[in-house]
Amino acid sequence: MCMGRMISIINIILFYFFLWVKKSISELLSSTQYVCDFYFNPLTNVKPTVVGSSEIYEEVGCTINNPTLGDHIVLICPKKNNGDFSNIEIVPTNCFESHLYSAYKNDSSAYHLEKLDIDKKYAINSSFSDFYLKILVIPNEYKSHKTIYCRCDNSKTEKNIPGQDKILKGKLGLVKIILRNQYNNIIELEKTKPIIHNKKDTYKYDIKLKESDILMFYMKEETIVESGNCEEILNTKINLLSNNNVVIKMPSIFINNINCMLSSQDQNNEKNYINLKADKTKHIDGCDFTKPKGKGIYKNGFIINDIPNEEERICTVHLWNKKNQTIAGIKCPYKLIPPYCFKHVLYEKEIDSQKTYKTFLLSDVLDTPNIEYYGNNKEGMYMLALPTKPEKTNKIRCICEQGGKKAVMELHIASTSTKYISMFLIFFLIVIFYMYVSI
């Protein structure tokens, strides 16, 4: 018994060491991790809970909406044992190498990764004594629109409770991954005409970039790469996994004008110079509380000192609306509430039948870590970008306070569901119209 417990503890230590190492690598390569933990996390584990004898199982899980290149999706599922997981199973068995295209189909309905146009090397599997660890790495190129699923299914595990009409029943852990084609803006270096220098085997490329562009180039083995003055390109994503193809995804915002150089030299002394240029991002929607509307650094806002004492005024900004606006900012060189806006935001929740704004992590509100943050503490300027449209519509706030006066930035974030609701309404109106005409 002690030996089994010791092995379990060692496994947990090794697991978190693995995650720490992987996290360090991911930070180096600027990837995002989505962890669906059905074993260690008390909020999402699939252990049995007390339910009525006729009740169905509880479902827990996570949704990964449009992950980008190099991102890691991690599934942690307990192994079958004689206790809480006596009838647990992973469906499909070799997830993520195969996955379901419907949440509740069985193992025989699984499709292979080739159906998804993804190479097997992007699916990583590890086995510990108590649990399975499965990782899907989003590839450099993906050109389909699909929603896929994997299940950590403990719903068949049941235990009677003596003297009660209730039972202990396991939960269903569901991983939902929404994949969308997001690579329409790829710049392939091999298809770009270089400027050939006088020196032999030396090439130079001049690349003009836009926000969210993807730069792809092939790098031979044993190539030395150096960066000159490219540190001002914040929030880039880099992926090196695919056959020596290097992919760099540009951020949603360029804080400054960019003019920097990447240089490489391989073992055959072939030299490549890539000159990257980009213009500073302009016309950012947001609220500047130091200038009149239209006069500040952002499109909207007002002078906070013009607000009557003890009153508040709201400045409203929309993200992911019809114009697909994905970035927003606030300028407040005064007291900011919450202090770390936009990482922390005010979000309305109902507590004791009363609606009130409380502080939450924006990543928790939107249920995604795929958020870009930018800040200039000295100027009191902060920005965020949402490269991926959230699944749910949300309304959040940050407050700028000065001498008892409050200027509220209210951010309305549209969702993917809005589009489908609009399509449904159009279809519904067409049906009503034809019914009316035919009468």
Curated annotation (Swiss-Prot):
Organism: Plasmodium falciparum (isolate 3D7)
Gene Ontology CC, one term: side of membrane
SMART domains to which the protein is assigned, alphabetical: s48_45
Disulfide-bonded cysteines: 36-62, 77-152, 95-150, 287-315, 332-400, 341-398
Gene from which this protein is expressed: PFS47
Gene3D superfamilies assigned to the protein according to its UniProt record, in alphabetical order: 2.60.40.2860
InterPro entries: 6_CYS_dom, 6_CYS_dom_sf
Endpoints of the signal sequence: 1-26
Lipid-modified residues, GPI-anchor amidated serine kind: 415
Protein name per its UniProtKB record: Female gametocyte surface protein P47
Glycosylation sites recorded in the entry for this protein: 106, 125, 324
Domain of life: Eukaryota
